[in-house]
Amino acid sequence: MNIYIQTNSKQFLASKVSAYSFIRFGHNVKLMNFEESEILKKYLGKKYLRSGKLKTYENDLQSFTPLRFLAPILNNNKDLILVIDPDIFAISDPKIILDNVNDDYDLYCTSYNKILRSEMMLINAKKIQWNFEKIIKELFEFKIDYKDLMSLSFDPSLKIKIIDNKFNSHDKITDDTVLLHTTNRITQPWKESLIIDFDKGNSTIFNYFKNITKKTLGMKFDRNIIQSKYQKHPDHKVLNAIKTIFLEAKRNNFITEQEIQFAIKNKFISEKIFN
């Protein structure tokens, strides 16, 4: 099974460690790098719709996300492929995901709060005929909303099967977890203590001061909104699992000392992940 991982310079080292977590189980992995996509780069600074609101496309922590729709073409529109974000790691052999496959479906993914999640997709590439350049063009022509793109509702022809969340486990590890997704960006273990470098979305000035007030009054508040630095992951099992994979990748020379020091120097990762 071929694995396609989306990435960019900010998440490149993490994506290599993610790749290692799959390769150790004998799978083929290919990285899809934003910096290598001329189609995406030409839209930097352009406007697009996200939940009906205008946003500016920037090369930030998640500039790679549209690349997930390129993977079937890269695989010559054949075979089953697994497409994932760079912050997803194989805790156990993901080959069991193939037990869900039958010819009735084009795509398999998880659902949270009744919303389909495209950060992990098992795609029957021979059934998918996405025109990547057309999709991106329509995104920046406001014909497709980013929210609809990510939730897969932009393509009503898709036959989608919802599979168990153990294949996209959000920030927790259980005995059943196959793929761990460190989806809460503020607690990604390789970023701990670094200055936050992503758009918090709902972090308006009003929300910021509202949560500061709540904290002062001893009320329940949203820590993510008022933090200026990446925080330690609250789940020790997740933290230890990610550290172990990073250390294994380093020990087996899958990531080099030069790559590590470059990432630390540019504040793409925190040296704490190796301590």
Which stretches of residues belong to each language-model region?
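Extreme N-terminal starter segment of soluble prokaryotic enzymes
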Residues: 1-3
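A glycosyltransferase accessory/donor-loop signature
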Residues: 10, 31-33, 42-46, 129-275
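Short, acidic, metal-binding catalytic loop of nucleotide-sugar glycosyltransferases
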Residues: 21-28
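Active-site-proximal specificity loops/subdomain of glycosyltransferases
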Residues: 30-74
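GT-A fold catalytic core of metal-dependent nucleotide-sugar glycosyltransferases
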Residues: 66-113, 122-123
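Conserved hydrophobic/aromatic beta-strand scaffold that supports enzyme active sites
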Residues: 71, 107, 118-122, 160-162, ...
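Conserved catalytic core of nucleotide-sugar-dependent glycosyltransferases
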Residues: 99-153
